[in-house]
Amino acid sequence: MCIILHSCTARLPQAQNLQIELKQDQVQASFKSNEKKNSIFIKLVSEKPMLINRRVESSNLLHSNMGGFLAKKTNSNSKIRNSFTSKCTSLMKQQHARLCIIRLCATMLLRSYTDHDDY
């Protein structure tokens, strides 16, 4: 399963913290595991794909470093996937809200600038 995050999502502080916390040695350790069928790829745009093991037993280190990014420790892979999807959805909603606010501010500034020139 391959999940691609847009570059605007990668610029958010939570996504940057995720990139920082997934250090190279953790990624290499997960590549060496023999359970490649139980893993997913997270591919950030303009970044190399990172392999994260979905198995809860072997992902204790990743789970503790993500600070609640994944669901609580369960044996269900669907809960982890749903948690990841909901986190991405909430990040995209935050980014959309920020863009709407910036658009409104720019519109107000342009209108006040053009109205001020008429006088």
Swiss-Prot record:
Q: Where in the cell is it found?
A: Cell membrane
Task: State the residue spans of region: Required for DVL/RTFL small polypeptide activity.
Answer: 83-114
> Is this entry keyworded Cell membrane?
yes
- Main location, first listed in the record: membrane
Q: Which GO terms describe its cellular component?
A: plasma membrane
Its topology with respect to the membrane?
Single-pass membrane protein
What are the protein's UniProt keywords? Cell membrane, Developmental protein, Membrane, Transmembrane, Transmembrane helix
Residue intervals passing through the bilayer:
96-113
Biological process terms from the Gene Ontology for this record are: negative regulation of cell population proliferation
Function of the molecule: Small polypeptide acting as a regulatory molecule which coordinates cellular responses required for differentiation, growth and development, probably by restricting polar cell proliferation in lateral organs and coordinating socket cell recruitment and differentiation at trichome sites.
UniProt family annotation:
Belongs to the DVL/RTFL small polypeptides family.
Can you name this protein?
Answer: Small polypeptide DEVIL 24
